[in-house]
Structure formats: structure tokens, C-alpha cells
Amino acid sequence: MKLFVHNFMSSRFLKNVTVGYPLNLVVKQFVEKDIEFDRDNTIVMLDRIQYEALIVAAAAVNQSDRIPREKPEKWDELTDEQLRVFHHLLMNIDVIDGELICPETKTVFPIRDGIPNMLKVDAEK
């Protein structure tokens, strides 16, 4: 599961959950893949994400020191080198084994072989 995907996931479908975002991320294993950098595509992705959730995800893979704590005001004013760091976090890091945890109910959703399992039994929905 790429960190870009994590940024869009929530547990709002659970009973008694009002926000369910961002899901806490516990990473047991991840791999780094080499996905080709595209400046324009990276800027489009960054315009769509919630920056605070990216900070949380970056911390889960011990990479939070690579990005600024505050969201940059204009993505298109960043250098290619700066954008490559964001691209690396969003697209090159692939969580293979771990957990997503609902911030409200603490329901745990496993990540196995890079696939998050968001299915829950009817009693938990």
C-alpha cells in the first residue's frame, strides 16, 4: 500500500465513527520501489492530499525528518529536488505488512502483502 493511498483511506463506514481520519499507520515492513518522477504529476498529487496525514505516514516509516512540518504554500515553487522527496514518500514507499487503526474506535485493519483489509463483520459496521 503506497502512502498516497493511505492519505485517502478512512473508517467512516464503522458504526459510531464520525470522522475516522486519518487512520493511524503501524508499519511492520515496507519496501522502496523506484517509480519514475514526474514533476507535474507530483504537484497534482500534493494538491489533493491532507498534509497532516502525510506527516503521520512519514513518521510511521521513519522518514518524517525528510519533509517540513509545515505545508509549503505553493507546491509549484518547490525545486525538483524538494518535489522528489515528496514523490518518494507518496509513490516509492510501499507498506507490505502493517496495520491501519481507526482513530476513534481503535479498530485494527491489517495490511498483508501490501493490501489493506478494510472488511469488518456486520456487528462492527
Curated annotation (Swiss-Prot):
Entry GO MF terms: protein heterodimerization activity; tRNA methyltransferase activator activity
Predominant location category: nucleus
GO CC field: cytoplasm; nucleoplasm; nucleus; perinuclear region of cytoplasm; tRNA (m2G10) methyltransferase complex
Gene3D superfamilies attached to this UniProt entry: 2.20.25.10
GO aspect biological process, one term: positive regulation of rRNA processing
Disulphide bridges, residue numbers: none
Keyword flag ATP-binding: no
TRM112 domain boundaries: 2-121
UniProt keyword terms in alphabetical order: Cytoplasm, Nucleus
CDD domains named among the record's database cross-references: Trm112-like
Protein's cellular compartments: Nucleus, Nucleoplasm; Cytoplasm, Perinuclear region
Pfam families for the chain: Trm112p
Family indicated by similarity: Belongs to the TRM112 family.
Function summary: Acts as an activator of both RNA and protein methyltransferases.
PANTHER family: MULTIFUNCTIONAL METHYLTRANSFERASE SUBUNIT TRM112-LIKE PROTEIN, UPF0315 PROTEIN-RELATED
Protein name: Multifunctional methyltransferase subunit TRM112-like protein
The species this protein was found in: Caenorhabditis elegans
Lineage, opening ranks: Eukaryota, Metazoa, Ecdysozoa, Nematoda, Chromadorea
